[in-house]
Amino acid sequence: MTDSASHSPAQAAPSGCPLSWPQQRQNLILFAVCTGTQYLAAPVLYVGITQASLCNRLGADARTSNLPGTLFFAMTAMPALIAWLSPGVSSLRRNLSLCYATSALMLTVLAVTLALPVSNQIKVAMIILQGGISGAVMPAAIALLWEVIGRGSDESRRGLALSMAFGAGPLLAVLGSFCQTALLGGDLFGLHFAGLAYPTSFIILFAAAVPIMGLAALFSQFFVVAPVEKEAEREPLSAVGGLIAGLPLMFASVALMHCSSVPLEAADALPGSAVSRTMMQMLGGLCAGGAALSFVHHFRSILRQRVLLLATIVTILVYAGNVIPSNMNLYSEQVLGNVPLKYAGVQNMLRFGFKVVAGTVLGWFLTRTNPRAGILATSSIFLAAQIWAILVTGPWYLVAFGLHGAGELVGVYAPNYIVSASHRNELRRNLAFVTMLMVPAAPAGYLYGSIVDFVSESGWQVMGMNSKTLGFRLSFCACAVFILCGIILAIVKLPAKPRPGLDSKELI
């Protein structure tokens, strides 16, 4: 970059960005800072491990402890709804700031609730709500950040911001996880942390993220977004009708299934309990079917294309691995001999630490292979994490969280395949579609928790394993089966290098 280029608006925007270089630089720095705040608060914003350990501490069963993570991923359809409700470019900064502010408010409410002398049921409900709110606003914030940086900077100048955001960012997540370990207590590579007493430790953990999100909300106001000649108008309701119908049906399905699974001793005290439990299970199944049909209707234009349909099925199957960390954390008591909350920090640290290394290696790997290889590599690591969790006990069990963190990069390489299989004029629509593929995979988290509770309540024991250990290992097996099916389908059916001009014409 020459000095004259850095001071010339005309030269600063060779691809059409109307902003001057100082304005673009400001946007790039703010992008990196806002992304960094999300990583620093990752122990509470990446819903799963921390929330599951807290629910467990409050006496919740495995089904309930999995609900925060399930709801988090179920709400990842919200970016599409927010984009529909407020499509104007002029509202980008406001919407981004509101997302961060909403997260800060929810974290404040949760911290206060944990400090109040209220029942554990209310506290668990607030934890689940925090999972849902985080699932709604944080993916929306990420989508808005990308749109702001897309409109507010030249493509050739984004490299430094991206390296700062996604190179240093995960290191901030490691730092946040270290602080989590110091607060909750536990052992970290030979160092012992006594931690603070409960509930003070969790109150401080959630409260500490409030000012971090507050800063992100404040920084969002300083983005520079060039005005457009004509603002986009809101599309008709029919454009998002499938989502609007599918989301509440999915929530109703999980709620009905959860209510139908109350302990037998509690259910027997209710009149007509057997009938009501059966009825709730039937209604839950109908709601699940209705949700599936609604989502298929919403995505019908994409799912008519053979390669995109197959890639979607592969992605959903593999994404079922994203909702297993709650069970992996809860299993800590069985395999490590201490309560799950004592391992939440080190588990998150390994998760993000492995991700830093894997991100670098896999990026190099992709440049020398093909889009399908990226899916297969990350999916295989995902599968290895479950096999490790099934077979390994003692301190080495924790490596499963590192492998899982590296495997989570399938969330980068599966979308990359779908982008590679898409026509240029369909990219924006298909990228919006990709962000919502966690929605149909989200109920798998509740399934994993249900497996644990069912086996435990049934008292099954095999090969010297108690029912709790057996239940967790079976849930890991179920997760591994989903991932393995995705891998096999990718190998057999997906072309290594999809051809948008040819493959997308193979309509089914």
Whereabouts are the PLM-identified features?
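Structural signature of the two symmetry-related core transmembrane helices
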Residues: R94-L110, A373-W388
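A membrane-interface helix-boundary motif in multi-pass transporters
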Residues: L92-R94, A182-P211, A266-T278, V452-I483
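Helix-loop junctions at membrane interfaces in 12-TM secondary transporters
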Residues: V112-Q130, W388-A400
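Multi-pass alpha-helical transporter architecture, strongest
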Residues: A111-A115, P211-V224, W388-A389, S475-I508
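Juxtamembrane intracellular "pre-TM" segments in multi-pass secondary transporters
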Residues: A10-R25, A226-I313, L507-I508
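Helix-loop boundary and gating motifs at the non-cytosolic
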Residues: P9-M78, A83-S86, L256-A266, V307-N348
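Substrate-agnostic recognition of the 12-TM MFS/MFS-like secondary transporter fold
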Residues: L30-V44, G48, P68-A83, C99-S103, ...
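C-terminal transmembrane helical hairpin of 12-TM major facilitator-type secondary transporters
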Residues: A373-G411
